[in-house]
Regions:
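C-terminal cap/substrate-recognition subdomain and adjoining C-terminal extension
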Residues: 2-10, 86, 93-228
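Metal-dependent phosphoesterase signature
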Residues: 67-102
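Active-site neighborhood of HAD-like aspartate-dependent phosphohydrolases
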Residues: 2-60
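Residue-level signal for pocket-adjacent positions within structured domains
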Residues: 16-17, 71, 141, 152
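Short acidic (Asp/Glu) patches
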Residues: 37, 62, 102, 106
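Electropositive phosphate-/nucleotide-binding environments in soluble metabolic enzymes
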Residues: 24, 62, 66, 78, ...
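N-terminal alpha-helical segment
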Residues: 51, 65-68
Length: 228
């Protein structure tokens, strides 16, 4: 009976997004929104504050992805939900679509031909990446979600916050719910912070990897891909 269940299970391909399939990161999205404030003075002020915070973002990301999320998404505090969602298609056309790596479509096409369910797990905001994922043909995804009160962002994320071990936990729960065999599945990421996610599938791949992830991939004989 267990063997029959195993045969019926499907496999999936789990993708990180920023740095893996596209060259942009969370700061590019924040910068885009900072330049689209109501009024010139507010736009200049918000853009300057965003630029000034980049060293802080980099430092906290090296220390802890969870701390980074707390600091980074605080920058959205006070933003109108309607405006953020309104500009999401413009964000896609002007920033995200041109940033898709040349090899991304080849990887996705091969994965789909192999019958793998396509799933993205990203630390970006849900509304900001939805048009991109539709363009890439990735129907299943989980992303971070801002908390809004009376139509304005509080600067806090709703749980679960997609980062590091949380991504791996979400994948396990998704696989259990959807009948996905993780031992037959693939995972793709560029960052060592996604090591938990890469470690739970049968076929992990380091894509455009940072130094630490590349060394880990070499030690474990994982696939190393360059989509740039």
């Amino acid at each position: 009976m267990q063997r029959q269940k195993k045969q019926e299970m499907r496999a999936a391909a789990f993708y990180d997004l920023e740095g893996t399939l596209v060259s942009t990161n969370l700061v590019h999205t924040l910068g885009f929104y900072a330049q689209r404030q109501q009024g010139l003075l507010k736009t200049i002020t918000k853009s300057a504050k965003t630029l000034a915070k980049i060293p802080l973002f980099a430092a906290t990301d090296l220390y802890s992805r969870n701390v980074f999320n707390q600091v980074f998404f605080k920058s959205y505090e006070g933003e109108s939900e309607d405006r953020l969602r309104y500009f999401s298609n413009e964000l896609f056309e002007e920033v995200l679509k041109p940033a898709v790596f040349p090899g991304t479509f080849t990887l996705l096409e091969k994965s789909k031909k192999n019958g793998l369910r396509q799933v993205a797990i990203t630390g970006a905001l849900d509304f900001s990446v939805a048009p991109l994922l539709e363009y890439l043909g990735i129907e299943d995804f989980v992303a971070n979600r801002l908390e809004f009160v009376n139509g304005y962002a509080t600067g806090r994320l709703l749980p679960p916050v997609m980062a590091s071990a949380t991504k791996a936990r979400w994948i396990r729960e998704f696989a259990e719910r959807e009948g996905i065999s993780l031992s037959d599945s693939y995972a793709y990421s560029d960052s060592i912070s996604d090591l938990p996610m890469l470690s739970i599938v049968g076929y992990p791949a380091a894509v455009n990897p940072d130094f630490r992830l590349k060394q880990t991939a070499l030690q474990h004989d994982w696939a190393i891909l360059n989509l740039k």
